[in-house]
Every structure is written in structure tokens, then in C-alpha cells.
Amino acid sequence: MAKGIDTRYRHKRLSRQWALGHFWTLVAWVCAWIMFFPVLWMVLTAFKQEGDAYTDPPRIVFHPSLTEFSQVFSGGVGPPFAHSLFVSLVSVVLVLALGIPAAYALSIRAVKRWRDVLFFFLATKMLPYVAAIVPIYIVALHLGLLDNDWALVILYTGFNLPLAVWMIRSFLLEIPREMLEAARIDGANLWVELTRVILPIAIPGVAATALICVIFTWNEFFFAYFLTATKGPTVPVFMVSFLQTEGQYWARLAAAAAVACLPVILAGWIAQKQLVRGLSLGAVK
């Protein structure tokens, strides 16, 4: 009898776990579709003509057209893409070049008062960026950096550096200390330890950090609009040109947004494995 009761209890527990697992799976799929639906609607609108984009109620079935994409590419999207690509790549390279040694000094070979340094990095993210636009604009004006890609490179490097230091530090803390001690016993200096031992292990975390910084840099609009809107607009600033006083070109704006999202989506797809490994590397002790 005891065996039968135990079997029924185990079966009931497994059934409850099965139902709970399917419930959370359903919740995850619903959340995923809620987040994905605006992107799907943007892509569908991009293949519509302007007349179809304005219909109420919206048309689900329509004749696909590449007219708006041709308008986007003929409207001078090349220079903004070049500006965004240059600013994103150079700023991320600078962030990694500064962030990796800083994270090393705050984790493996911790400097004095390292907690205060970490708090300083975190405190810089608490400042409202809007309050800094006027002094930043004045400094850029006096240095001749308005409508210059290097103004955004310097700015985005400063914005992304605290986040990069925090993330890379959490990844470096997961590296076994025994490996570092063995490398030091073998005579490895600081450079060899960093490049031959630490970076090969932490490369997924570094890749995840770099991709997050690229996404922020590529999508940033506020400072790019005020500092480079006249001669050197980035992709987000270029997209605003489709919002005009005589009317909103929704299909063309959706096509421009789809084109603007493509490089980031492609980079995320290529680095998907590294991104997942990197984001999970520092999550579990």
C-alpha cells in the first residue's frame, strides 16, 4: 500500500511539474511575441506602399513593394551608415582597450580602494545625460568637434566604459585563480598573463560586452542629433528626416528602420553563441 501511495504521489508531482513547465513556456512565448510583434509590423509596413500603410483598419494582405526601400537608398543613406559604422567600431575598440585593463585592476590584481573606484563608475551612470548636453555642446563647439565623428567617439567611449568595466570585471572574477598562479610560476609577465591566459577564457564575456556597446552606440539619437545633425548625421538622425511637416511617410520610415536594424541584427546573429555564453559566464558563481 505504501508503495502505491508513493507512486501516486510521484505521478501527481510529475504532472504538476509538467503543467507548471508548460505554463511558463506559454508565458515565455507570449512575452516573446509581444516584444517581436512591433518588429514584425515594422518589416511588414516597410514592404507596403504609402497608401497601404495609412489604411484603417490596417491591411494584413497587401501587394509587397520595394518602392520605399529604393527611396531610402536613393535618399543618401550611405554617408549616415558610414558615420555610424565608424563611430561604433572605433568607440567600442577604445572601450575594450581601456575597459579590459581597468577590469583586470579591479578584479584579479585589485588596486587600493577598488570599491570606491567601482562606485565611481556606477555613479557616472546615475547622472542624467540630458543635463550634460549644454556643457558638452559648448566644449565641442570650442574644440571644433561639431559635425565631427570624433565628438561622438569620445562621448560614447565615456558612456560605455563604466558598463564595460563592470561587465568584464564580473567575467574575470570567474577565471580560476589556480590557472593564473600556474602561469605566474611559469614566468608569465603581466602582458602574457592578460593576452595568453585571461583573454582566451574571457572572450565570450568580452564579445557580449562589445555587442552591447555596439547596440547602444548604433541606436543613440539624442547626442548625435545635437552634435552631428548638420553635416555628419548618424543613422538614427537620418531616419528623422522622413518625419516632415507636410506628412509622415510611415512606410518609408519603416523601411529606413528595417535597414538601420539590419547590421545590429546581423552582428547579434553572428555572435549569438558568444553572446549567450558571455552573458551567462558571470551570472553563476
Model-derived regions: residue spans:
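A hydrophobic, multi-pass inner-membrane permease signature
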Residues: 2-285
